[in-house]
Amino acid sequence: MTDRTTDPVPAEPAPVRHPTARLIDGKAFAANLTQTIARDVQSFHDRYRVTPGLAVVLVGNDPASEVYVRNKALQTHRAGMRSFMHMLPATTSQAELLALIGRLNADPEIHGILVQLPLPAGLDPVAVTNAILPDKDVDGLGEVNAGRLALGQPGIVPCTPLGCLMLLKSELGDLRGLHAVIIGASNLVGRPMARLLLAEGCTVTVGHIDTRDPAALARQGDILVVATGCHGLVRGDWIKPGAAVIDVGITRISLPSGKTRLVGDVAFDEAVTRAGCITPVPGGVGPMTIACLLNNTLAAARRIVGATDAA
């Protein structure tokens, strides 16, 4: 009888461990910023006997917008400010909406006005945002504040790009010399984001719907800001290893289970293996947008009353 030896069963290969990006906690940053704003609101009230007031106008009954607007009102109250909600039916005419904005412009208790976008078909968002007094345009979307930003002059900066910039500086510090790639060229995010990053000394490239090879462009970015509204557009291999990724997108998708979840424009599970740091969705840019709205409202109130002391 001969001895038989059996070959050892090969061991399971060890799982490949990928580096994981740092999460940029916009929720925590926004909470700290809101606490600071609340203290500043109290100091402002103690000195000037004025409580900053924010008017938010929602036209139509889009459920996502309704939730967002109510959250804005809640955060406004938490910061010690007054909130004025105006919920209008989708049948509201342009003339009716402009008349309301005119009344809000003239109301001394209101220091900031925000019209929730998008508006229903038939309403002109450019005319509506430009009807808001520049000093009360706390979303920074009117032509006066947009022009000031383009020229590098003081003005009200759009909330979402401002929040993105705060998060980037908190993670990276000095941004000078970095190549920032922005995917998305909207007036709401992409264009003002580009101007803010230029002012910080970045080399800025903006990709848009007609960009021929957006993946190749994205891979050049030390900073990658994505704001397209197309969930999962940016795959992991679009990202330069170690880049800072800011995902502005937010979309609610349906799962096979029948449940829903919020996702961004970046394929998060792929991105975390390549990025150096990244904002999650939710909990990244969204909370910062609201915190910056409160910050802009307080700043608007200070300008309107002629406050000269440091904020």
UniProtKB/Swiss-Prot annotation:
It catalyses: (6R)-5,10-methylene-5,6,7,8-tetrahydrofolate + NADP(+) = (6R)-5,10-methenyltetrahydrofolate + NADPH; (6R)-5,10-methenyltetrahydrofolate + H2O = (6R)-10-formyltetrahydrofolate + H(+). It holds the Pfam family THF_DHG_CYH_C. GO terms for molecular function: methenyltetrahydrofolate cyclohydrolase activity; methylenetetrahydrofolate dehydrogenase (NADP+) activity. GO terms for cellular component: cytosol. Its EC number is 1.5.1.5, 3.5.4.9. Pathway: One-carbon metabolism; tetrahydrofolate interconversion. Homodimer. CDD domains: NAD_bind_m-THF_DH_Cyclohyd. NADP(+) binds at residues 184-186, 209, 250. It comes from the Bacteria. Catalyzes the oxidation of 5,10-methylenetetrahydrofolate to 5,10-methenyltetrahydrofolate and then the hydrolysis of 5,10-methenyltetrahydrofolate to 10-formyltetrahydrofolate. The keyword rRNA-binding does not apply. Transmembrane segments: none annotated. This is Bifunctional protein FolD. Keywords: Amino-acid biosynthesis, Histidine biosynthesis, Hydrolase, Methionine biosynthesis, Multifunctional enzyme, NADP, One-carbon metabolism, Oxidoreductase, Purine biosynthesis. Belongs to the tetrahydrofolate dehydrogenase/cyclohydrolase family. One of its GO terms (biological process) is L-histidine biosynthetic process.
